[in-house]
């Protein structure tokens, strides 16, 4: 199977690890902010079929770990591919499942410079936050007899509806949520170092795991 066929079947998705941000310079001298993502080869650890599972999909493993770091059930699961144990597993739908083999490696060669991708990651956790920090509320006056400054104010009426509507913006956990940023451009590929440079910022902290797939709107 050649690379072009593999790209079509894979829908161009791979797993990576965020290294950090830097800048590169365009031909006209403009400084371009980019995010460096380490993309080691992902390994197919499982094949799912319509007959057995109700749909066709492959499971990718990323980030090798020692065997004793995986649970016994996962050790048995990984043994089928015979490529070691992995920290991250990600399932992906595909059309022609018969074209794949257990243990097959997927590399960053499926992408090209200039392509648009959607990147999913886990945002930085900020802990418990109030409505001003979490939702950008304006807050109350600082003086002239104001009785509230950073409080949210009324969250609903008493007699009717006698409840707080779902989705009401309130204080609570900020960050540490899965987020997808769409239509980011691949600035360049560095296969010799297993790196992808993405123009702009991506979700998450350094060393966070990212799922990179072909943009749905490209």
From Swiss-Prot:
The record's section on Pfam families has: Ribosomal_L3
Entry keyword Cell inner membrane:
no
Extract the InterPro entries matched here.
Answer: Ribosomal_uL3, Ribosomal_uL3_bac/org-type, Ribosomal_uL3_CS, Transl_B-barrel_sf
Alphabetical GO CC annotations of the entry are: cytosolic large ribosomal subunit
Q: Name one GO molecular function term.
A: structural constituent of ribosome
User: Per the record's keyword annotation, is Ribosomal protein included, yes or no?
Assistant: yes
The alphabetical list of record keywords is: Ribonucleoprotein, Ribosomal protein, RNA-binding, rRNA-binding
- Signal peptide start and end residues: none
Q: Name one GO biological process term.
A: translation
HAMAP family reported for this sequence:
Ribosomal_uL3_B
Quaternary structure? Part of the 50S ribosomal subunit. Forms a cluster with proteins L14 and L19.
What family does this belong to?
Belongs to the universal ribosomal protein uL3 family.
PANTHER family to which the protein is assigned, alphabetical = 50S RIBOSOMAL PROTEIN L3 (PTHR11229), LARGE RIBOSOMAL SUBUNIT PROTEIN UL3C (PTHR11229:SF16)
Q: What does this protein do?
A: One of the primary rRNA binding proteins, it binds directly near the 3'-end of the 23S rRNA, where it nucleates assembly of the 50S subunit.
Q: Which NCBIfam families does the record cross-reference, listed alphabetically?
A: L3_bact (TIGR03625)
Protein known as: Large ribosomal subunit protein uL3
Q: Which organism is it from?
A: Syntrophus aciditrophicus (strain SB)
């Amino acid at each position: 199977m050649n690379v072009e066929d593999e790209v079509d079947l894979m829908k161009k998705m791979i797993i990576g690890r965020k290294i950090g941000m830097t800048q590169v310079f365009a031909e006209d001298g403009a400084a371009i902010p980019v995010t460096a993502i380490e993309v080691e080869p992902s390994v197919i650890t499982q094949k799912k079929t319509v007959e057995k599972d109700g749909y066709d999909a492959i499971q990718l493993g990323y980030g090798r770990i020692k065997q004793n770091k995986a649970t016994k059930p996962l050790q048995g699961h990984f043994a089928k591919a015979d490529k070691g144990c992995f920290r991250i597993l990600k399932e992906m739908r595909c059309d022609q499942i018969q074209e794949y083999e257990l243990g097959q490696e997927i590399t960053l060669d499926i992408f090209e410079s200039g392509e648009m991708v959607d990147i999913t990651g886990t945002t930085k956790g900020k802990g418990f936050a109030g409505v001003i920090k979490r939702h950008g509320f304006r807050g109350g006056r600082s003086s002239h007899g104001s009785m509230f400054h950073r409080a949210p104010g009324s969250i609903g009426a008493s007699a009717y509806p006698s409840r707080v509507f779902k989705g009401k913006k309130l204080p609570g956990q900020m960050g540490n949520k899965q987020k997808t940023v769409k239509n980011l451009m691949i600035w360049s590929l560095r296969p010799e170092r297993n790196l992808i440079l993405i123009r702009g910022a991506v979700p998450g902290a350094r060393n966070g795991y990212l799922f990179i797939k072909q943009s749905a709107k490209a």
